[in-house]
Amino acid sequence: MSDRDPKSESSAETRLPSEPARRRETGRLPPRGLSPDTLREIGLFGGLDEETLGVLSRELPIENITVGTRVVNEGDPAREMFVVLEGELEVLKKSPSGAEVRVAMLGPSSWFGEMSILDVQSRSASVRALAPSRLVRISAEHVDRCLYRRDLKAYALFVMNIARELSRRLRVTDSILAHFMGSVAEVYAPKKRG
């Protein structure tokens, strides 16, 4: 079975190769080129001890992504998340008409795909690189082996950091929805006649 999407072959957009191919194409950095100091600066790893940061920095691969590459696709199976070290990416959702709409921008220290670590569902959105980017790939197996089986406290902190970010995103979404619904109500509310 091919990883290629015939619908996107004619466009300038590319899809991220399968995991084995990605491992061969990690670019200028070795797959294990992280440092504990780099991870410490990212909120996802907040509160983790030095030893755990050391284990993660040795185990988590870095991937170099070119402009136009679709890192993940809405609806695809998912078992990994990504942390942005460098670059700029856009998060896209399909509208009811089928058009893709940008719903967020991602830059250094952002992460995406975390829901796949928690709920084992298909991708809820697509992510495409707008600039050359360097990403850390964290699979469910990494979380299990490096955190859950090794140190339950570290695992709990990691999941709590994800929960905090999901809560922040939900608050932003609630605010946007309230603003939108208020605007719709103003336009379509019956006018009082005097």
Describe the role of every protein-language-model region:
Residues 1-194:
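Cytosolic regulatory regions built on CNB/CRP/Popeye-like sensor folds
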